[in-house]
Amino acid sequence: MIRRRYRGCTQGAWIVSVGMLFASCTSGAWKASVDPLGVVGSGADVYLYFPVAGNENLISRIIENHESKADIKKIVDRTTAVYGAFFARSKEFRLFGSGSYPYAFTNLIFSRSDGWASTKTEHGITYYESEHTDVSIPAPHFSCVIFGSSKRERMSKMLSRLVNPDRPQLPPRFEKECTSEGTSQTVALYIKNGGHFITKLLNFPQLNLPLGAMELYLTARRNEYLYTLSLQLGNAKINFPIQFLISRVLNAHIHVEGDRLIIEDGTISAERLASVISSLYSKKGSS
């Protein structure tokens, strides 16, 4: 009887200890409100909003050949939506993920033996650096990731924008998709140099089209994506040739509204879309 009571006490003490450990770990979590786009920052060449549900196959294809594929997948598996920015000059992606993360066990997940170096910001937020990728989980409901070249921004700088957000100015529809809070599965992209992206979509990567900013919205449908694209036209003298070229290559409804070329009901395979998106940050695509 005494032994049973002792065993019960030790088991209870163990449970309480673990609970206290977990509580003490989460007590230091970031509790203030967070602006995802303000954290990734302004001045990017590409912005994206990526709900994970319904788009898992596309995400797997995009990160398939990345050096930090396994580490990125750890984060994605716990993510409901990604807010991202790509910076061509420094060849880096900054990602803010909303979801459910193992905040209390980051030291076990991102261990020194696996090549991670642990550091803290002036606000006491822990982050982990490796050769290609830097990660921080400031709270159980969001994470921050930077991956890219050695010129990429330091994670401490990104985390400083939790306090002082640097929010980019983005189109109304893009903003609307970002605030859908998981109710939409639409992938949204805003690209500063629309000509660079559209030539890859047309499969004419060497063609230099004088085009402005582009908005792209994609919805998964079986193994392909249905998309709507809005492209700012540049030189009025060549607008018609550009419209003609695009209409000959893309199977979609195309028309002009003011200074914008609108492409609706276009389709693209998940494999092709992943290739085009990946080319935006690949060494070849971002040189």
UniProtKB/Swiss-Prot annotation:
Q: List every stretch annotated Amphipathic helix 8.
A: 240-250
Specify where the region named Amphipathic helix 1 lies, as residue ranges. 36-40
Q: Where is the lipid attached (S-diacylglycerol cysteine)?
A: 25
Region (Amphipathic helix 6) spans which residues? 172-179
Q: Where in the cell is it found?
A: Cell outer membrane
Where are lipid groups covalently attached, annotated N-palmitoyl cysteine? 25
Taken from the UniProt entry, a GO cellular component term is: cell outer membrane
Question: Biotechnological relevance: how is it used?
Answer: Recognized by sera from 43/43 syphilis patients, it shows promise as a diagnostic antigen. In diagnostic tests for syphilis this protein exhibits a sensitivity of 98% and a specificity of 100%. A fusion with TP0453 (residues 32-287 of TP0453 fused N-terminally to residues 38-450 of TP0326) exhibits a sensitivity of 98% and a specificity of 99%, and both proteins exhibit superior accuracy in classifying analytical false-positive samples than a commericially available test, making them candiates for diagnosis.
Q: Which InterPro entries match?
A: TP0453 (IPR049340)
Q: Cite the residue spans of the region called Amphipathic helix 9.
A: 270-279
Region named Amphipathic helix 5: 155-162
Please list where the region (Amphipathic helix 3) is annotated.
Answer: 69-77
Which portions of the sequence form the region Amphipathic helix 2?
A: 56-63
Q: Which domain of life is it from?
A: Bacteria
Q: Where is this region: Amphipathic helix 7?
A: 194-202
| Cleaved signal peptide residues | 1-24
**Keywords assigned:** Cell outer membrane, Lipoprotein, Membrane, Palmitate, Signal
The record describes its post-translational modification as: Palmitoylated upon expression of a fusion protein with first 46 residues fused to PhoA in E.coli.
The record describes the protein's role as:
Might be involved in ligand transport, alters membrane permeability at acidic pH (4.0 to 5.5). Incubation of the non-lipidated form with lipid vesicles increases their permeability.
Domain comment from the record reads as follows: Forms a U-shaped beta-half-barrel with a large hydrophobic cavity (3549 Angstroms(3)). The cavity is opened when amphipathic helices 2, 3 and 9 move away from helices 7 and 8. Has 5 potential amphipathic helices (P1 to P5, residues 56 to 63, 155 to 162, 194 to 202, 240 to 250, and 270 to 279 respectively); P2, P3 and P5 form helices in the presence of lipid vesicles.
Q: How does it assemble?
A: A mix of monomer and dimers; may integrate into the membrane as a dimer.
The identity of this protein, by name, is: Outer membrane protein TP0453
Q: Which organism is it from?
A: Treponema pallidum (strain Nichols)
